[in-house]
């Protein structure tokens, strides 16, 4: 998979994309991430990418021209261009608090695409006409951040985990919280007893069937207690 990230702060991505599983996925060439500086497409001598909002109001708005040129540089065609296989089209995402809340089902679908183009907004957001070139707006929660870079990192990390070869044990992904609309079951490691706190006896039984049943029960119990809304999906 190729991911193009359009941002005015490219330096923010240096650490998160070179460590852990994401860094290894890039080394294995499972994942290719291209950080594109939107300012490099500004025709202003000061590389300005924002301007005042028509109609007045506080805050600045990201200009359309440099955003358009940055988007086109990734190979994106018209928004409604047809492809024999829809997952071969570059899928353009704008990280926005007004978008759909990121979920496991969204991530699974995004992982099917060959190329994602992620736009990171700033200030009061982007010129609304940018939406003519965007396939979907995605949010990571009902709160406001200083920009779209951190949400973009969340999207990249969660999507990359779904790609074959990124997580060594595929079963680890399938047993994670939300994968089947259930939270994950409790995990324990050595020692079996710590300051009087013992792990459940069933985990020491060696009976894989009983262990599996216990995990399903605990997963359901935890979901019912903490996220009952997931059971309604």
UniProtKB/Swiss-Prot annotation:
Binding-site residues, S-adenosyl-L-methionine:
121, 140-145
Listed Gene3D superfamilies: 3.40.1280.10, tRNA(m1g37)methyltransferase, domain 2 (1.10.1270.20)
Compartments, as annotated in UniProt: Cytoplasm
Q: Which GO terms describe its molecular function?
A: tRNA (guanine(37)-N1)-methyltransferase activity
On the tree of life, the source organism's domain of life is: Bacteria
Give the principal location in a single coarse category.
cytoplasm
Q: What is its EC number?
A: 2.1.1.228
| Record SUPFAM superfamilies | alpha/beta knot
Q: Which InterPro entries match?
A: Alpha/beta_knot_MTases, tRNA_m1G_MeTrfase_C_sf, tRNA_m1G_MeTrfase_TrmD, tRNA_m1G_MTases_N, tRNA_MeTrfase_TRMD/TRM10
Q: Which controlled-vocabulary keywords does the entry list? A: Cytoplasm, Methyltransferase, S-adenosyl-L-methionine, Transferase, tRNA processing
| Keyword Signal among UniProt keywords | no
Catalyses which reaction(s): guanosine(37) in tRNA + S-adenosyl-L-methionine = N(1)-methylguanosine(37) in tRNA + S-adenosyl-L-homocysteine + H(+)
The question of whether Nucleus is a record keyword is answered with no
Q: How does it assemble?
A: Homodimer.
As for what it does, the entry says: Specifically methylates guanosine-37 in various tRNAs.
Q: Which family does it belong to?
A: Belongs to the RNA methyltransferase TrmD family.
According to UniProt, the name of this protein is: tRNA (guanine-N(1)-)-methyltransferase
Q: What is the lineage of its organism?
A: Bacteria, Pseudomonadati, Elusimicrobiota, Endomicrobiia, Endomicrobiales
């Amino acid at each position: 998979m190729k991911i193009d990230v359009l941002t005015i702060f490219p330096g923010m991505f240096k650490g998160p994309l070179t460590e852990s599983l994401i860094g290894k996925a890039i080394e294995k060439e499972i994942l290719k991430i291209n950080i594109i500086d939107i300012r490099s497409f500004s025709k202003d001598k000061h590389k300005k990418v924002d301007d005042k909002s028509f109609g007045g109001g506080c805050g600045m708005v990201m200009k359309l021209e440099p955003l358009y040129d940055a988007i086109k540089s990734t190979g994106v065609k018209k928004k409604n261009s047809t492809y024999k296989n829809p997952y071969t089209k570059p899928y353009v995402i704008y990280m926005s608090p007004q978008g759909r809340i990121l979920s496991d089902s969204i991530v699974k679908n995004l992982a099917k695409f060959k190329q994602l183009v992620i736009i990171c907004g700033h200030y009061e957001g982007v010129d609304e006409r940018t939406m003519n070139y965007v396939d979907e707006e995605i949010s990571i929660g009902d709160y406001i951040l200083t920009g779209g870079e951190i949400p973009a990192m969340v999207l990249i990390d969660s999507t990359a985990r779904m790609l074959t070869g990124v997580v060594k044990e595929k079963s680890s992904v399938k047993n994670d919280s939300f994968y089947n609309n259930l939270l994950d079951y409790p995990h324990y490691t050595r020692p079996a007893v710590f300051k009087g706190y013992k792990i459940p006896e069933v985990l020491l039984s060696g009976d894989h069937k009983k262990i599996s049943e216990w995990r399903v029960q605990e997963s359901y119990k935890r979901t019912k207690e903490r996220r009952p809304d997931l059971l309604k999906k």
